[in-house]
Amino acid sequence: MTASIGKTNLLGLTQPEMEKFFDSIGEKRFRAGQVMKWIHHFGVDDFDAMTNVGKALREKLKAVAEIRGPEVVSEDISSDGTRKWVVRVASGSCVETVYIPQGKRGTLCVSSQAGCALDCSFCSTGKQGFNSNLTAAEVIGQVWIANKSFGSVPATVDRAITNVVMMGMGEPLLNFDNVIAAMHLMMDDLGYGISKRRVTLSTSGVVPMIDELAKHIDVSLALSLHAPNDALRNQLVPINKKYPLKMLLESCQRYMSALGEKRVLTIEYTLLKDVNDKLEHAVEMIELLKDVPCKINLIPFNPFPHSGYERPSNNAIRRFQDQLHHAGFNVTVRTTRGEDIDAACGQLVGQVLDRTRRSERYIAVRELSADADMPQSAATRT
């Protein structure tokens, strides 16, 4: 949908922002709740469809505001029920959103940026450079689009989307304000009413923003670890050179402590053949995380062209898992979903208009991890 010049896009406004908007046009604040319900509960993008809003106000809204989500380029459905949407954002780039059904739970994986500046060596999103931050409307718009696609009207009844993970393209903490606003809308009863424990933000480790996070929102936290020591993580996740593991894990523990509840950090660990999948790496990981309340998601690498990495054997994956399991950690191995529509872990596709490497376009890849309440193995740490 093309932007209308000078009009306010209501899709990305939080409740306080929506109330300020209605103040600014001389209307009462209760109108904010009315309009938000139409937008998020019923997926409406036409003011004339808002039957409990008077005609005069509808005409005023049409003159000064719009409800505009990202443009849906394509929607694919896998044989296992996984869905993938390619959406075009205002920068001209396309990003992807993936829905993973599992029993009564449905998890939506949402992107926060077009491209990424972190340049993780096993992720081709980083190879294409950073293009743009998504607006709050473009972030929450992915939930809005998916919800409408499922016909979940109102959004809070018999919902298809029970969990949202900020694990798509980009580093969410480098688009802090827009991601925070979108997550508030995910949890707001006037938005999508999703429990705070079912909204997960995944980060590669932007320490100052992890410390800032607890001041603004209470959601589950996942850490893209991928290596058990600084030397290896410096190679795989270059931001580690700025924020090494000790500093990073301390910031994660500060975040969890600040929430004042017993929380568990989700650790994401992509297994790369002969790189970080040896038993010695598992032993290092046990030592590194021994004092961190956490659960561990092991993600076997899904190769993409020219990645330079391979998926470990099933035996290697099982040995690594068993080593952690025997040390008392909750450990799961990610099951490949949506492979036939390129929606599996490490297969997300997005055409990004690259401002930092204009001569190349790459298939965008960002690991897709489980939602915050993914069932765990029987082992429990004491």
UniProtKB/Swiss-Prot annotation:
Active site per database record: 96, 345
Cofactor(s), by name: [4Fe-4S] cluster
EC number(s) on file: 2.1.1.192
Keyword Glycosyltransferase tagged: no
Domain of life the protein comes from: Bacteria
Positions that bind [4Fe-4S] cluster: 116, 120, 123
Covalent S-S links between cysteines: 109-345
Membrane spanning residue stretches: none
Binding annotation for S-adenosyl-L-methionine: 170-171, 202, 224-226, 302
Keyword annotations: 4Fe-4S, Cytoplasm, Disulfide bond, Iron, Iron-sulfur, Metal-binding, Methyltransferase, rRNA processing, S-adenosyl-L-methionine, Transferase, tRNA processing
Entry's family note: Belongs to the radical SAM superfamily. RlmN family.
Reported function: Specifically methylates position 2 of adenine 2503 in 23S rRNA and position 2 of adenine 37 in tRNAs. m2A2503 modification seems to play a crucial role in the proofreading step occurring at the peptidyl transferase center and thus would serve to optimize ribosomal fidelity.
Note: Reaction proceeds by a ping-pong mechanism involving intermediate methylation of a conserved cysteine residue.
PANTHER family: 23S RRNA METHYLTRANSFERASE, RADICAL SAM CORE DOMAIN-CONTAINING PROTEIN
Protein name (Swiss-Prot/TrEMBL): Dual-specificity RNA methyltransferase RlmN
High-level lineage: Bacteria, Pseudomonadati, Pseudomonadota, Gammaproteobacteria, Pseudomonadales
